[in-house]
Amino acid sequence: MMRGGMGNMQKMMKQMQKMQKEMQKAQEQLAEKTVEGTAGGGMVTVIANGHKQILEVKIKEEVVDPEDIEMLQDLVLAATNDALKKADELAAEMMGQFTKGLNIPGLF
């Protein structure tokens, strides 16, 4: 009886190691994937990776008004939040396969 228990334990450990490697690979892929957040009808674009690192900010010339810096700040903020939301969704989609069936609040 002990022998079967040990075999199951080894099998479980191997499955866990495999899953851990797959999760690590998915994390690496997240770093390479990008998402784009926009605001003002595309006047401001923010590009982030799946790890929520901002990689690029693009601002169209037409939206730059020295008399209204606050509007530009709002657009940059909105585009950044849009990009970060999309990065969260991407991470949840990619990592969700590993947490399927587990109900761990706040994990992804």
Swiss-Prot record:
Assigned keywords, A-Z: Cytoplasm, DNA-binding
GO cellular component entries: bacterial nucleoid; cytosol
Source superkingdom: Bacteria
A GO molecular-function descriptor: DNA binding
Residue ranges of coiled coil: none
Principal place of residence: cytoplasm
Keyword DNA-binding: yes
Subcellular locations according to the entry: Cytoplasm, Nucleoid
Keyword check for DNA-binding: yes
A Pfam family it matches: YbaB_DNA_bd
Biased composition (Basic and acidic residues): 19-34
NCBIfam families assigned to the protein according to its UniProt record, in alphabetical order: DNA_YbaB_EbfC
Its job: Binds to DNA and alters its conformation. May be involved in regulation of gene expression, nucleoid organization and DNA protection.
HAMAP family: DNA_YbaB_EbfC
Protein name, per record: Nucleoid-associated protein GWCH70_0020
Species of provenance: Geobacillus sp. (strain WCH70)
